[in-house]
UniProtKB/Swiss-Prot annotation:
Synaptic adhesion molecule required for the formation of target-specific synapses. Required for formation of target-specific synapses at hippocampal mossy fiber synapses. Required for formation of mossy fiber filopodia, the synaptic structures connecting dentate granule and GABA neurons. Probably acts as a homophilic adhesion molecule that promotes trans-cellular interactions and stabilize mossy fiber filipodia contact and subsequent synapse formation. Required for the coalescence of vomeronasal sensory neuron axons. Belongs to the immunoglobulin superfamily. It holds the Pfam family I-set. Keywords: Cell membrane, Chromosomal rearrangement, Disease variant, Disulfide bond, Glycoprotein, Immunoglobulin domain, Membrane, Repeat, Secreted, Signal, Transmembrane, Transmembrane helix. GO terms for molecular function: cell adhesion molecule binding. The chain crosses the membrane at residues 536-556. This is Kin of IRRE-like protein 3. It is found in: Cell membrane. Disulfide bonds join 69-127, 170-227, 271-314, 356-398, 440-499. The gene is KIRREL3. Coiled coil: none annotated.
Amino acid sequence: MKPFQLDLLFVCFFLFSQELGLQKRGCCLVLGYMAKDKFRRMNEGQVYSFSQQPQDQVVVSGQPVTLLCAIPEYDGFVLWIKDGLALGVGRDLSSYPQYLVVGNHLSGEHHLKILRAELQDDAVYECQAIQAAIRSRPARLTVLVPPDDPVILGGPVISLRAGDPLNLTCHADNAKPAASIIWLRKGEVINGATYSKTLLRDGKRESIVSTLFISPGDVENGQSIVCRATNKAIPGGKETSVTIDIQHPPLVNLSVEPQPVLEDNVVTFHCSAKANPAVTQYRWAKRGQIIKEASGEVYRTTVDYTYFSEPVSCEVTNALGSTNLSRTVDVYFGPRMTTEPQSLLVDLGSDAIFSCAWTGNPSLTIVWMKRGSGVVLSNEKTLTLKSVRQEDAGKYVCRAVVPRVGAGEREVTLTVNGPPIISSTQTQHALHGEKGQIKCFIRSTPPPDRIAWSWKENVLESGTSGRYTVETISTEEGVISTLTISNIVRADFQTIYNCTAWNSFGSDTEIIRLKEQGSEMKSGAGLEAESVPMAVIIGVAVGAGVAFLVLMATIVAFCCARSQRNLKGVVSAKNDIRVEIVHKEPASGREGEEHSTIKQLMMDRGEFQQDSVLKQLEVLKEEEKEFQNLKDPTNGYYSVNTFKEHHSTPTISLSSCQPDLRPAGKQRVPTGMSFTNIYSTLSGQGRLYDYGQRFVLGMGSSSIELCEREFQRGSLSDSSSFLDTQCDSSVSSSGKQDGYVQFDKASKASASSSHHSQSSSQNSDPSRPLQRRMQTHV
């Protein structure tokens, strides 16, 4: 059988099916197509398939929709089936004007387009290729139907007597699926409604009814209540509303006088009301607390700053209800914090937002500043720092100022997360052969995840490796990583050390060099602060030496004191040290007067005999002559002259005591002797010396102390000095100042050493005109 004969047979089947019912006609059409396709495949062997098939879809009633069907290279008839019923053959759907077959027929496109979907279009659809004997998967088309406009029974205005309950009923009909109803008042949902649904005869649409009960206390005059119905077909919903018309409670007006007012002044609140029926009660409250002493229209009170933010309310009541009205008082007061600013921890590059709220009256000014900076960052409640950097971290101050009233401030901290920052001394010091440390100080928020030391080919993060140990500690300021090197060698001073720290935001590196401690002092560059340990060692050694010398001097002084008990006169030797005290002398007449005065004082006391004094003067004169004839073996090296215009050179010659412990060639200096006020007493303003030193051996009340007292009261005849034989004592240079165990308060800062001349020259102040050096001759 040829193809055109099959097509003719198919048309016959179609015409025959027209005489039958729609359901039978569809079956006949399918059988006809299948028969035709079978013969065609037998004759031609062609196989077809769908490139597009209809899919399940949802459409809102009244909207167009298209069901896809495409069979490439197929030029035969396509049949659309709806719930098992054929809509027509090919593109001829004249029986259903709302349906169209669209698409390129040559490309095998046979799409079914519904121009305006209706509830009856809600069905299962299928695309069939008759000659190819294939059919598509069934596709479900769901048609959504929005509800009718909702209706509130009794609307649009519902009259209600105050105190009566309110029942509202709203229904929304003919929706698919059933609508949902909500009740609204002032934009807020009212809960507590009840619902009921009814399925309509078509089995697809539904109606819904909602009932809302409102108690009398929740109803206000002129209030609008909304009923809104929604379903999938209309998500925005449809709504209607009613207005409640009831007798209103009292209308209240509340006034405050005077305003503005300073704190601790009296104000008057007046509450006037209009009501029907008449007002039955006035009630006053502040911050929700009832004011018991107020019960009428007027309330008087003394206000403070709380009245500015805490309103006073007046509640007026009649038979239909109550009305409450509140007022604040314009009280002048200084700034008070209402919202505390909070410290922030932010990431580098992000924004930091601080909020700080104050209350004050009159209007206050808010100033945001960074602590330590005079720059105003903001005058608003909110301070926003855009793209913060690490240098933005610190303290920020929110300050509020009420003109002519007061000011207040709060401080917050901004912490910025960022890469570590290493701030360490690039040159650090250590001693050769000792243990040395290199410190790396790291500031990092968040704390560093890793810290590593590297030098040469070595890398060490923690623990010990050979001579190297790494320790890390955390402090409030940051993290300190210490590289400890034991038994430092020369090569360590030539090595470059690298300290690197990482955190989640990045890293930082510092190059540190190790320098030998004390190298600056050797090169003449001066001492550095790192040489303190050597200075401590030297100080300890010197202290030990001084202690030893003090002990030796005490022993020598004790021996000298015992040997002096048997001495009758003063014996002068060439080897004795001569201490020359250079000063200016007044006129010879004054010298004689002083000489006579001192001699008379000595005679009055009776402690020294006249001939012993004369003997001492003669001995001193002889020694002076011998000294003048003696050649200085040092060529004046130890002669320290301060002035050359002196009129005379008085010399004190001190004889030695036994035993003589000084080494050969060393100087001896007198001990147990005080120079206090000697020359100030004798010479007045014209003298050169004003020694404040007082040196006393630690031997209690001895003959040396008595000698000292008499020496201060004695005289110097003919510009010469004398000492009693019992006062003669000396200490070897090996004792130095160790022999002096007790000092006068005026001499603690400049105690005498073993060479009195050296001590005097070192401790004297050149700016003092009355103090000069002593000349010491060996």
